[in-house]
Amino acid sequence: MNGIYFSGTGNTKYCTEALAQATGGSAVSMESREALEVLRASDEIALGYPIYFSDIPRIVKAFITEHAAMFRGKRVFIIATMGLFSGDGAGLASRLLRKCGAAVTGGLHLRMPDCIADVKLLKKTPEENRALIAAAQKKIAQAANAIKRGIYPKDGLSFLHRIAGLFGQRLWFKMHAKKLCERLKIRTE
């Protein structure tokens, strides 16, 4: 399966490439010129993105909506990477993709080292980060083997996941993100 991803830190790139390679494909960044050709040429793709404050990045929303016609009839497997927990990380894109006429085959949530350094809960030691990566590698290998047998993981796609994502995180994180933005101070001197 070929993959298209957005990756700010390299985590989602790593995970999407690993799943694509394990299922006989390759992966490209949605920011590259090749992304639209991969989307056009593939009947089935993996779409990977990070979760930002329990939400889908704007660039991913824009990619899906701007190329909605190209997603029609495609089978899409969603990979969502996160620092902690997202609830419905895969469900966020799933709802958009279904509106475009895509068939969402499944979802895979992968915890990876986080890049946010000012939230104590997200800070990890190097050993903890290595353990997160090892667990993600194992989960990717298991998912790839299942996909080869026609069994797709369904992380983040149920109604309960949606409730957990909305009430457990998204509402709180939006308020928290606003506070962080208000505290941001930039010196122009």
Task: Report each predicted region and the residues it spans.
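Cysteine-centered iron-sulfur cluster-binding motifs in ferredoxin-type domains/subunits
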Residues: 184-189
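FMN-binding flavodoxin-like domain, especially the glycine-rich phosphate-binding loop
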Residues: 1-3, 7-14, 20-34, 41-49, ...
